[in-house]
Structures are given as C-alpha cells and as structure tokens.
Amino acid sequence: MSSGGLLLLLGLLTLWAELTPVSSKDRPEFCELPPDRGTCMGYSQAFYYNPSQNKCLPFMFGGCKANPNNFKTLEECKRTCAA
C-alpha cells in the first residue's frame, strides 16, 4: 500500500474513532461528577458532561484544582463522556 493510501486509512480510522459514541457502560465514572469551578479565580469557558441531559454543557472554570469532569473543548467532552 502506498504512503498516501496509508495516510488516508489512518485519517479515516481517526475520524471513525472521533465519531463513535461512548456507551454508558464504557463511560468513565468521573463523567457523573457535577461541574467544579475549582479553587482558582480565573475565568475561562470549559465543558462538563451532564448525565441527566446526556450531553456536554459549558461552564466557567477557574483555572485549577477541579474534578476530572472538565474539558477544554466540547469535542473532547463528547469523545470522553457523551453516549
């Protein structure tokens, strides 16, 4: 297989992995934690998984010492927690 074909295959596999939903049985336990602003006084948008709505939602993150249900991007939250 040519290097171009391998790159195409790798790209397609990566896309498939990104789009494959996480089943609730495979979802990490920390996805059930409530949003945690943390103890610092920063002000930046982050995302957390809301299990009752089964989706990722924005919240304001203080910048440090929060629980692991805290993602920089919506895509990262969906990939990790959303079913």
Curated annotation (Swiss-Prot):
Spell out the InterPro entries in the cross-references: Kunitz_BPTI, Kunitz_BPTI_sf, Prtase_inh_Kunz-CS, TFPI/VKTCI-like
Asked if Lipoprotein is a keyword of the record, the answer is no
Signal peptide segment = 1-24
How is this protein named in the record? Kunitz-type serine protease inhibitor vestiginin-2
Q: Where is this site: Reactive bond for chymotrypsin?
A: M41, G42
Give this protein's Gene Ontology molecular function annotations. serine-type endopeptidase inhibitor activity
For this chain, the family text in UniProt reads: Belongs to the venom Kunitz-type family.
Q: In which tissues is it expressed?
A: Expressed by the venom gland.
The function of this protein is: Serine protease inhibitor.
Which SMART domains does the annotation name? KU
The subcellular localization recorded is:
Secreted
Cellular-component GO terms for this entry: extracellular space
Disulphide bonds in the chain? C31-C81, C40-C64, C56-C77
- Keywords, A to Z? Disulfide bond, Protease inhibitor, Secreted, Serine protease inhibitor, Signal
What positions does the domain BPTI/Kunitz inhibitor occupy? 31-81
